[in-house]
Design a protein with these regions (language model features):
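Conserved active-site regions of diverse hydrolases
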Residues: 20-244
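Gram-negative bacterial Sec-dependent N-terminal signal peptides
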Residues: 2-27
Length: 244
């Protein structure tokens, strides 16, 4: 955790340096010309994709909910929002919302709905390529028959594709694009090994494949489409988290 705090502090300092330019009446206030943020990933970048139904009700009662953060429930920000504030650029909204919980949970959900003009595509539980993310609604069907939250878990590949569709197939070059993904691939593979469904060696190979795929997607679907400022964040040290 100490290592993660140090990295975030360094990242914030770098953004502050980039944001030191004088503000003009006809453009961004930072020297690199960033005027928007686009985010892809999983729960660590999700700003409310699941803040619907019963989850939204909890939010009304507590001042928060639908966000994966240990920060204050009222006004607590995740890292993408802090970076947006430092640049400064507008904080965007979830590009898709929805939840399809199993009936046994007693929770109500909402249809999966795309949100026009919103460019945070990150969703809790999402993997790099596979749609079968952590707590995915797809696991509710046979042969899995899981009782779970029914998360959308749109994979990062599809998140990037959705943005290209929404933005006319390219980037302006003035966005800060953030990518943080891969942890859920590790978790799913770890669970598969624990269940005896595959060997540790196969799991390591699958995780390496996901990492290579992520790099390829960033090159072909982000950089090659005109993005100039791309921030790819390494996975946190999972062994130092409560899960690890």
């Amino acid at each position: 955790m100490k290592d993660m705090r140090w990295k975030l502090a360094a990242l914030a300092a770098a953004v502050l340096v980039a944001a030191c330019g004088g503000e003009s009446a006809d453009g961004p206030s930072n020297k690199v010309g960033i005027n928007a943020m686009v985010s892809f990933g999983d729960s660590l970048s999700d700003i409310g994709s699941y803040n619907v139904g019963s989850i939204a009700g909890l939010g009304q009662a507590t001042g928060g909910a639908g966000r994966f953060t240990v920060n204050a429930t009222t006004g607590g920000q995740i890292w993408t929002e802090r970076i947006a504030a430092l640049l400064p650029v507008p904080t965007t909204c979830p590009a898709q919302t929805g939840l399809s919980p199993s009936p046994q949970t007693g929770l109500t959900g909402a249809p999966f709905t795309a949100k026009s003009g919103c460019f945070n595509y990150a969703q809790g539980g999402s993997r790099v390529t596979s749609p079968y993310g952590v707590n995915s609604y797809l696991f509710q069907a046979p042969p899995f028959n899981q009782i779970n939250l029914g998360a959308m878990t749109k994979p990062v590949k599809d998140q990037m594709s959705a943005h290209l569709t929404a933005s006319g197939g390219s980037y302006t070059g003035k966005e800060l694009v953030t990518v943080l993904a891969g942890a859920n691939d590790v978790f799913v593979e770890l669970g598969s090994v624990a269940a005896g469904a595959q060997t540790p060696q196969a799991a390591v190979t699958n995780v390496a494949t996901a990492g290579a795929e992520l790099g390829a997607y960033i090159k072909s679907m982000v950089v090659a489409k005109g993005a100039k400022q791309v921030l790819v964040v390494n996975m946190p040290y999972v062994a130092g988290t409560p899960f690890g």
